[in-house]
């Protein structure tokens, strides 16, 4: 079986405009050492906005 290592961590994605945390995802710390920024739909703003990784 594959080993469970600590390379993947669970992160929250927050909207940069309203600050609401809408999405939860995983990232690999080795491949993405910096904070992730993705364009996602924000239900509060009712449009696609940039979401940034929060701790």
Swiss-Prot record:
One of its GO terms (cellular component) is cytoplasm. It comes from the Bacteria. The keyword Ribosomal protein applies. Keywords: Ribonucleoprotein, Ribosomal protein. The keyword Ribosomal protein applies. One of its GO terms (molecular function) is structural constituent of ribosome. GO terms for biological process: translation. InterPro entries: Ribosomal_bL33, Ribosomal_bL33_CS, Ribosomal_bL33_sf, Ribosomal_zn-bd. HAMAP family: Ribosomal_bL33. Belongs to the bacterial ribosomal protein bL33 family. This is Large ribosomal subunit protein bL33. The gene is rpmG.
């Amino acid at each position: 079986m594959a080993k469970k290592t600590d390379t993947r961590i669970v992160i929250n994605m927050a909207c940069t405009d309203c600050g609401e945390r809408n999405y939860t995802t995983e990232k690999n710390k080795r491949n993405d050492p910096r904070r992730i920024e993705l364009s996602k739909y924000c239900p509060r703003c009712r449009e696609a906005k940039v979401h940034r990784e929060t701790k």
